[in-house]
């Protein structure tokens, strides 16, 4: 009899969650990044999300917190290697900040949870923390909400 593989939760983490995880690895965003690197959850991303993360991480403002360029590039490469990179066919325009639409596009295509601390994305969700687009309900928790639910899920 074949062994059943555990279903892994699919997530899309926004740029701020990634950066917060690097600045404070022991914080809640750090726990989320650990879950991704330990392959306990599956991160979905896109070339445009990776480009934004790289651009922000390599900015002079953040390099003083994150270390030298070589270290940052190694982390970004490792993150890319444990993520599923897709090129979404959808192009929603529902966010006040147009740059945030790329997270919705990836989550919609991959049926993933968007983990975010971004006020614009959070403002789009209903009282149950879902964003409804074309009859698809995308869960949009904050990092804290996600960790609380994940810990209940695995216990």
From Swiss-Prot:
InterPro entries: PIN-like_dom_sf, PIN_dom, PIN_toxin-like. Coiled coil: none annotated. NCBIfam families: putative toxin-antitoxin system toxin component, PIN family (TIGR00305). PANTHER family: SSL7007 PROTEIN. This is Uncharacterized protein MJ1680. It comes from Methanocaldococcus jannaschii (strain ATCC 43067 / DSM 2661 / JAL-1 / JCM 10045 / NBRC 100440).
